[in-house]
């Protein structure tokens, strides 16, 4: 049996080889996983910034220092804490500079690094994600500011989506997802809403964590590139993307099958019409007094 070609053309194979070489020069030891149409890297994002397509849209939830002491995701609240340590970067100031050269940029948690955003230089806007959605304030962040510099930034507004500890709206509701996949996992519905505000074909998340942005991008029909320096997050993101693509594949195959069976139904109907016409033609006309 002939071997399946990994690359459609020689040029594609050469390009992939050049990309691998560039990757190893920029970040020796970086891992790369291609799960078409997604590329995932395990490496420090800042080193890989030059590899990213310049026309892509950055949609990311970066790590940043939360408060003076930092937010402790390992602190138990009602239930025992799920995480034994905070994720990388939660104790450092975030510098958005490497990502601001992209034509479309959506940054979550912007209230933690206001002073580094170029608020005078390009069209930008703000959205407030209201996480309490009308519930009583508790020991959880009431909301989060999102900074957007997109082709046509929307007017400032509010996204309401319940997200306080175990109380989560949408597909991450505790009945569907009892344990979160990442200490700072974001809701799929919110990420999809943000991606819809961008126009680029490729969505870039340099701090992908468990890969929520990538899955959201796939659901919005975009390709995506994600980076995380933590190998565990990288593994979770890879398996999420793979599972999503399988689902989408099954869904597409289901849609195609439904389309085929509709076409079959239609041709069957057309066949029946032809048959009925033929029967009409071949049946000798009954005398008028014997017509039913
Ligand atoms: C706030 S979390 C993202 C969570 C994600 N939105 C989700 O839904 O799962 C930030 C992620 O950035 C990663 N990170 C921190 N510093 C990084 C760096 N320099 N390069 C790449 N990833 C980094 C952390 O490991 C963490 O997984």
Locations of regions flagged by a protein language model:
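A short glycine-rich, Lys/Arg-flanked "PGG" loop and its adjoining helix->strand segment in the class I
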Residues: 91-103
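Conserved phosphate-coordination/catalytic loops
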Residues: 8, 85-93, 181-185
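BZIP DNA-binding basic region
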Residues: 1-25
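Mobile active-site "lid"/loop adjacent to the S-adenosyl-L-methionine
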Residues: 66-92
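Membrane-topology and secretion signals of cell-surface/extracellular proteins
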Residues: 40-42, 191
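Beta-strand-turn-beta hairpins that frame and shape the catalytic cleft
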Residues: 32-40
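Class I S-adenosyl-L-methionine
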Residues: 26, 51-60, 64, 68-75, ...
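Conserved SAM/SAH-binding loop
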Residues: 43-47
